[in-house]
Design a protein with these regions (language model features):
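Gram-negative/organellar outer-membrane beta-barrel architecture
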Residues: 227, 232-431, 494-510, 515-525, ...
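C-terminal outer-membrane beta-barrel translocator/porin domains of Gram-negative envelope proteins
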Residues: 409-541, 545-549, 553-555, 560-563, ...
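C-terminal beta-signal and terminal closure region of outer-membrane beta-barrel proteins
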Residues: 558-612
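Alpha-helical segment of the N-proximal tetratricopeptide repeat
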Residues: 58-85, 96-105
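Signal peptide processing junction and immediate N-terminal pro/mature segment
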Residues: 22-40
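Bacterial N-terminal signal peptides
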Residues: 10-22
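Alpha-solenoid helical repeat scaffolds
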Residues: 60-61, 91-96, 126-130, 160-164
């Protein structure tokens, strides 16, 4: 194996100890047998000429002999660092000096020697590798990893450096990067796999999600596919992988799972999860793994007098963990106050003559959908459904507008999500989503309509290990073609039923929807930067600033009440900023608390939401 090669003047015993996660000094830090591993063709001092034509005073053979005799101080004295303008000693002598300094526990001086040598011999991969060993001993893992990547750029086939790099990433908790580093050298090899606790799921489904054969290499692709399948199939509340090193250099894979709380297994946790939306006059009854068949039923019931809602989804894997079939139901009865939304454009209604604009909307939609994974990078989702909407109690609203026609429709929804960039080394990923919704209405003049939307979703963890800091940016755009009913308009603002958040714009007014800008097309950018403040087994707290900016454009459809021009939209760009806290609870729920400030109007909004 590479790290047992006696001809390698690099930290020979470090990787053997790292593979069992018992960190030991590198050769640079421990001085392990370097004299025996010096290249046999080292140039004698008498034949090594410096740029000034002067020969070095110490020969490699004599310094090697001092090193074999463990005379560390004499080695250091025999190879002094040159003063400015003096010639640099040969590379082999600088390596011996750094090893001897490490044996004297002078790690800082050893690192200084290696840095000088790396500048003098920039194409010699041994120096960044040895310096990484010293920095590893000093627990500077991030810089050690950076140096090892530099060494691999100089010597791409250096299996030892690649093994070392994978180990450093593994010790930092960056399993993705460790697998990316190890896989080219056929590591890590799995001897065993355990799922703890053992789930009561169909065995065939488990075997397909967690494939295993003794002696196989655990690949990054396998890990990513499993993560994508678990995101598609809500089989567990949480899952984490643990690689346990074995004495023979192989690994055991432990898959730690947290099951969804059940009424029999965890009645208290299940009750808390069901009541998590109680502050919003709602409950979340959820039933997981029905009859141990991986079938789930997720429902949401809200009895708020201004916005009643019932949603339900019955889902199950089909044929393989890459496919999920689901039946959906969404029924709503909502009171809307459009007073400010309709008058956003002063050319329609003068602001000084505001009149209440109220309506009640009833809508029900039922459909069936199929979600399918292609590897770990592509997710295709499609569904067909039937919907019916009815508008009542219109006050101050142009009732003759097609927006408010009572109508039924059949619709097709389809989306494709693709991972464009996935860099475990830089801890950055970028995904794109394209979605289309097409509807055929049975009431004229609506006829047909199409809604298109696109998104770019970027995540970055700036630190080399952990998730203490996190940056998330989401860019979205949408457009509408054809005449649409009111419920198909986009909305920019904070509303727990809305995904297009502008957190400085409250979507409610006196509990009724309609306070946020509406329109037929939009652009939106959301950026969040948060910091992990606290984490324990029961709760984790993240806090940080955010910036939302966007524009929503009016529809071309005017009212039929004597006015001309669009009914909805915002005349200017909107920009909000603020602070947000996220509390992830042991019930697998996340509570969001925030303050948003509208930079244009100066208004403030306090908001909260909870998700599972």
């Amino acid at each position: 194996m590479p790290f047992l090669n006696p001809l390698r003047p690099i930290p020979l015993l470090l990787l053997a100890s790292l593979m069992v996660l018992a960190p030991q000094p590198s050769a640079a830090a421990s001085g392990v047998g370097y004299g025996a591993s010096m290249p046999a063709n080292s140039t004698p001092a008498s034949s090594v000429q410096t740029d000034s034509g002067q020969a070095n005073s110490a020969s490699p053979n004599s310094v090697r002999q001092l090193y074999r005799q463990r005379r560390w101080s004499d080695v250091v004295a025999a190879v002094p660092l040159p003063a400015r303008g003096q010639p640099i000693p040969p590379a082999d002598l600088l390596l011996l000096r750094s090893f001897a300094l490490a044996q004297l526990s002078r790690l800082a001086d050893s690192a200084q020697t290696l840095r000088i040598a790396a500048r003098a011999y920039p194409r010699d991969a041994r120096f960044p590798t040895e310096l990484a060993g010293v920095l590893y001993r000093q627990k500077h893992y991030a810089e050690a990893a950076r140096l090892l990547r530099r060494a691999l750029r100089l010597s791409p086939r250096d299996d030892y450096a690649r093994n070392f790099l994978g180990t450093v990433d593994f010790l930092q908790g960056n399993l993705d990067a460790a697998l990316a580093d190890w896989n080219p050298i056929a590591r890590p090899v799995l001897d065993d796999q355990q799922i703890v606790p053992a789930p009561s799921l169909p065995p065939l489904l488990l075997d397909r999600i967690f494939p295993f054969s003794p002696g196989s290499v655990y690949t990054l692709r396998q890990y990513r596919v499993t993560q994508a399948q678990l995101a598609l199939q809500p089989l567990f509340a949480a899952v984490s992988d643990e690689l346990q090193p074995q004495p023979d250099g192989h690994f055991r894979l432990i898959v730690h799972t947290i099951p969804h709380p059940g009424w029999r297994t965890a009645p208290v946790a299940n009750l808390l999860s069901t009541l998590r939306s109680l502050p919003y006059q709602a409950v979340d009854p959820e039933f997981w793994n029905l009859r141990h068949s991986a079938v789930s039923l997720v429902t949401y019931l809200r009895w708020d007098a201004q916005k009643r809602m019932i949603t339900a989804q019955l889902g199950s894997p089909i044929r393989s963990p890459d496919q999920r079939l689901h039946l959906d139901l969404d029924a709503r009865n909502e009171n809307w106050n459009l007073t400010r939304t309709l008058t956003a454009n002063a050319s329609i209604v003068p602001v000084a003559t505001l009149q209440p604009a109220l309506l009640n909307q009833e809508r029900i939609r039922a459909g069936i959908g199929l979600d399918e994974l292609f590897g770990s990078r592509l997710l295709w989702q499609t569904s067909v459904g039937f919907s019916r909407r009815r508008f009542r109690s219109l006050l101050g609203v142009p009732a003759a507008s097609p927006y408010f026609d009572n109508t039924s429709a059949v619709g097709l929804r389809s989306s494709l999500r693709a991972v464009l960039v996935d860099s475990p080394i830089h801890r950055f990923d970028l995904a794109s989503t394209l979605a289309v919704q097409a509807h055929h209405y049975f009431t004229r003049p609506l006829n047909r309509s199409v809604r298109l939307s696109a998104a770019l979703d970027a995540h970055w963890l700036p630190a080399s290990s952990g998730d203490r800091y996190r940056l998330h940016t989401l860019l979205r755009a949408g457009d509408t073609f054809g005449q649409i009913p009111f419920d198909q308009l986009w909305m920019l603002g904070f509303d727990r039923d809305n995904s297009l958040w502008m957190r400085g714009h409250n979507g409610l007014i006196n509990g009724r929807k309609g306070n946020a800008p509406l329109g037929a097309r939009y652009l939106l950018a959301n950026t969040d930067f948060d910091h992990l403040l606290w984490r324990d087994p029961f709760v984790s707290v993240r806090f940080g600033p955010f910036v939302d900016t966007g524009r929503i454009y009016a529809s071309d459809e005017g009212s039929a009440s004597g006015t001309s021009g669009p009914l909805f939209g915002a005349p200017r760009w909107l920009t909000d900023t603020g602070l947000q806290a996220r509390l992830h609870l042991f019930t697998s729920s996340t509570l969001v608390l925030g303050w948003g400030h509208d930079l244009r109007s100066g208004s403030n909004t306090f908001y909260s939401a909870i998700s599972h």
